[in-house]
Amino acid sequence: MKNIAVLGSTGSIGTQTLDVVRGHRELFHISVLAANSSDELLEQQIREFEPELAVLSDEAAYARLKSRYTGKTQLAGGRQAFIDAAAYPAVDTVVTSMMGFAGLEPTMKALDAKKNIALANKETLVVAGEIVMRRAKEQGVSILPVDSEHCAFFQCLQGEKRETIEKLLLTCSGGPFRGKKREALIGATKAQVLAHPTWNMGQKITVDSASLVNKGLEVIEAKWLYGVDYDQIQVVVHPQSIIHSMVQFCDGSIIAQLGCPDMKLPIQYALTYPTRQSSDFERLDFWKLKDLTFEKPDTDTFKGLRFAYEAGKMGGSMPCIFNAANEVAVGAFLKGAIHFLDIYDIIEQTMMKRACILEPTLEELFEEDAWARAYAASLLEK
């Protein structure tokens, strides 16, 4: 029986993680549930899964829940309580399914407590990949990717040596605007941006998918997870989202991982590894597959991917700057404060304004994140 902590349990990945647990109650026990502010949904989850601890980062939401709930689960509130939940003693594996830079502190806390990580919070590796991977190695714990693409790489590389990797072929649906040029995106609405053709996800990651920033974040994540150079990571647009990613080896062979687009599959793989367990997930029917097509990404129109490669190759603190500027810009877009294409301008201007720290400490990364957010926010006022 694995004891699981789900950080971000009320979000898209968190709720799908609980779906996986429902299908294998003989394998998993939910010890900790933690969310930001969705107190009503968290209360439902508490009553169903009966964890030892439940946390709400938002103090007002915590107060609301505390006034209603009278069960056995211990409740805690506030940002520090959320971070501390990652190190809960009884937990074996921590699912980090919260969004953005806010995932870094809880992930580091979990690593310091020698917890295995099922990583859905890609920003942790984007911002502090070298530090995080080194800490995991020092602590002797595993970081198992929950992203469908990185889970695909992980499976393709089973039994293979890292030095035999020639290229990681990172697939990308292309998002709702695939094939469109910049002129067609000038008046893109929030509804259009959030209409992803394949995946049902939270709003922030859906915007990132439309801008291809999400694919850029995954490029940087792949660099740290698999120890390859950026020139070895190639993004391939694959609209059907059936091939989740591929690895090309030094002899020219390519191994691909295929499956129906369902996030529960990589979630279950991460939770059950090193074994595979049965599931009732949809099966791929090759007789019904009409075609599998591939395209080169348009990085002139979708500049977020190009900026990610540039930030990654600069290294140091620049991916942190890139990520922070994007988080501010996406937040502003979702509030209707800027246009979709303004996201790229804010990222570019913020990256150009700041010198790169080549070997930043964790403390310096927090400072750089704060600076980038403040500067990006100042651009919104112009």
Feature-to-residue mapping (PLM):
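Catalytic, metal-anchored helix/loop core of enzyme active sites in primary metabolism
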Residues: 1-382
